[in-house]
Curated annotation (Swiss-Prot):
One of its GO terms (molecular function) is membrane insertase activity. A lipid is attached at C26 (N-palmitoyl cysteine). The gene is yidC1. It comes from Streptococcus pyogenes serotype M18 (strain MGAS8232). This is Membrane protein insertase YidC 1. The chain crosses the membrane at residues 58-78, 129-149, 170-191, 198-216, 222-240. Residues 1-25 form the signal peptide. InterPro entries: YidC/ALB3/OXA1/COX18, YidC/Oxa/ALB_C, YidC/YidC1/YidC2_Firmicutes, YidC_ALB_C. GO terms for biological process: protein insertion into membrane; protein transport. It comes from the Bacteria. Its main location: membrane.
Length: 275
C-alpha cells in the first residue's frame, strides 16, 4: 500500500515539476555570451545553434531547421509518451470499475484497491512513469528554445518570406497556421482514445484559440517556431501513432471477437439440437 501511495505521490509531483520549471525559467532579461547563469548559457547555446543554421543569414531558416532538429531528437521520447498515454486511456474503464468495487474509505479497502490497480497495470504492461519521463525531458528543451527566440537580440532581427521576425505578422497568416496545426495535433492525439477526456476535448479548441490570439502580439519568430513544431507533431502522429490505423485495428479486433462469440453460440445451439 505504501509503495502504491508513494507512486501516486511521485506522479503528482512530476506533474507539477514542468509548471515549476516554466515559472523558474521564464526570465525576461536579455541573454548574452556573458550571462552567468547555467540556464541562460543553455538558452544562448540554442541561439548560437539557430544562428549557425541560418543559411544566407536567414534567421527564419535557422529557426525552422533547429526546431526540426530538436523535434527529431525528441521523437523517441514523444513516441513513448503517446503510447503510454494511450495505454493509460485504454484501461480507464477497468480502473473505474475497480474504484466502484472498492469504494470504501477504510484502510483494508484502499489497500485492496491499490493491489488490484497494480495487478491491472501489470496485466496490460502499463507503467505510470512512462509518460512522465519524456515530458520532464522535453519541457526544459522546449522552454530554452522558446527563450532563445525571445531573449537573444540577434535572433530578433531579419525577415522570412513576408514577415519581420521581430514584429507580429501583419497578414496574420502565421498565427492562423500555428492555430491550425495546434488544433490538428491535439485533435489527432485525442482521436484514438477509447473514452474522451472532457478536459482534453476542451483543450482541442481552447489551445488553438490561445495560440491564435497570442500570435497577434508576439514576434513572428516565436510564432514560426510554434507553427513548425506543431506541424512536425502532426506528421509524427500520422506516421508513428496514426489514430486512424489505431481505430481501424481496434474495430477489426472487435469484429473478430464478435465473430468468435457468434461461432461459439452457433456451436452451442448445434450441440443442444444433437442432444
Amino acid at each position: 500500500m505504501r509503495k502504491v501511495l508513494r507512486v501516486k505521490k511521485n506522479i503528482k509531483i512530476a506533474r507539477i515539476v514542468p509548471l515549476v520549471l516554466l515559472l523558474v525559467a521564464c526570465g525576461r532579461g536579455e541573454v548574452t555570451a556573458q550571462s552567468s547563469s547555467g540556464w541562460d548559457q543553455l538558452v544562448y547555446l540554442f541561439a548560437r545553434a539557430i544562428q549557425w543554421l541560418s543559411f544566407d543569414g536567414s534567421i527564419g531558416v535557422g529557426i525552422i531547421l533547429f526546431t526540426l532538429t530538436i523535434r527529431l531528437m525528441l521523437m523517441p521520447l514523444f513516441n513513448m509518451q503517446i503510447k503510454s498515454s494511450q495505454k493509460m486511456q485504454d484501461i480507464q474503464p477497468e480502473l473505474r470499475e475497480l474504484q466502484k468495487k472498492y469504494a470504501g474509505k477504510d484502510t483494508q479497502t484502499r489497500m485492496k484497491l491499490a493491489e488490484e490497480s497494480q495487478a491491472l497495470y501489470k496485466k496490460y504492461g502499463v507503467n505510470p512513469y512512462a509518460s512522465l519521463l519524456p515530458l520532464l525531458i522535453q519541457m526544459p528543451v522546449m522552454i530554452a528554445l522558446f527563450q532563445a527566440l525571445t531573449r537573444v537580440s540577434f535572433l530578433k532581427t531579419g525577415t522570412f518570406l513576408w514577415v519581420e521576425l521581430a514584429q507580429h505578422d501583419h497578414l496574420y497568416l502565421l498565427p492562423v497556421l500555428a492555430a491550425v496545426f495546434t488544433f490538428l495535433s491535439t485533435w489527432l492525439t485525442n482521436l484514438a482514445a477509447k473514452e474522451k477526456n472532457v478536459m482534453m476535448t476542451v483543450m482541442i479548441y481552447v489551445m488553438p484559440l490561445m495560440i491564435f490570439f497570442m500570435g497577434f502580439n508576439l514576434a513572428s519568430g516565436v510564432v514560426l517556431y510554434w507553427t513548425v513544431s506543431n506541424a512536425f507533431q502532426v506528421v509524427q502522429l500520422l506516421l508513428l501513432n496514426n489514430p486512424f490505423k489505431i481505430i481501424a485495428e481496434r474495430q477489426r479486433l472487435a469484429n473478430e471477437e464478435k465473430e468468435r462469440r457468434l461461432r461459439e453460440r452457433r456451436a452451442r445451439k448445434k450441440a443442444m439440437k444433437r442432444k
